[in-house]
A protein has these predicted regions:
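Sec-dependent bacterial lipoprotein signal peptides
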Residues: 1-23
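Bacterial signal peptide processing site
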Residues: 25-28
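N-terminal low-complexity, Pro/Thr/Ser-rich intrinsically disordered segments
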Residues: 30-50
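Post-signal-peptide N-terminal segment of Sec-exported extracytoplasmic proteins
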Residues: 43-81
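Extracytoplasmic beta-rich ectodomain segments of secreted or membrane-anchored proteins
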Residues: 72, 83-104
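Long, charged/polar, surface-exposed segments that mediate recognition or autoinhibition
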Residues: 94-161
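An acidic-aromatic pocket/loop used at catalytic or ligand-binding sites
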Residues: 99, 118-123, 169-197
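Beta-rich nucleic-acid/ligand-interaction surfaces
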Residues: 162-167
Length: 197
């Protein structure tokens, strides 16, 4: 009797594992299928923020940042002196709900921009204030990113390195948005065509 119960538990456990693997592979294959489909369209989406573009030189990036700083639209921030700015939150009634954004270009060996990194957090974040957590921030940022970068919707992907991210792919441009910790949300925008590798 005990052996039969043990075998039944093993079957149930085995079935759950197989089901989890199938679901996980399906999401990953959905990501691969969407990436392939978008790259096959040969549409280029190189626009970033502040008239920056994938494919610009590193010097162009610094010149734009210099002008933005001169116009007092950005400041040199605390995170490795990356440019920073404050965004108004949709939930402006909550104290501390403005969002601090820092950003930096990703460059190849030829000093050509191949991507863009951004970090966000609520200015009033504290560990005990769940309203200003990265979970809530990520949901809000998805809407903002869709406005900044119109096109396809976000979908969730669990990558092999235990990274769970919201992904948006439009042509050659992939946007990953994910929680770094309870405070920060990271956004990484990259050219997936390999043109700037």
């Amino acid at each position: 009797m005990k052996k039969q119960n043990f075998l039944n538990l093993n079957r149930i456990f085995f079935t759950i594992i197989i089901f989890s693997l199938i679901v996980g592979c399906h999401r990953k294959s959905e990501y691969s299928a969407i990436l392939t489909r978008e790259l096959e369209k040969k549409n280029e989406f190189n626009d970033l923020i502040f008239d920056m573009k994938i494919g610009q030189s590193r010097q162009d990036y610094f010149d734009i940042c210099y002008q933005l700083n001169k116009q007092k639209k950005i400041i040199s921030g605390a995170r490795s002196l990356n440019p920073e700015l404050i965004l108004k939150s949709k939930n402006g009634s909550t104290k501390g709900s403005n969002i601090k954004m820092s950003f930096n270009g990703i460059f190849n060996e030829k000093k050509t921009m191949r991507g863009f990194e951004m970090r966000f957090y609520f200015t009033g974040w504290s560990n005990w204030n769940k309203d200003l957590s990265s979970e809530n921030l990520l949901a809000q940022l998805k809407d903002t990113l869709k406005r900044w970068f119109p096109g396809n919707d976000f979908f969730k992907v669990n990558f092999e390195n235990n990274l769970s991210a919201e992904v948006k792919i439009d042509g050659n441009r992939r946007i990953l948005a994910y929680k770094v910790n309870s405070k920060d949300v990271a956004v990484r925008i990259e050219d997936m065509s390999g043109k700037y590798d």
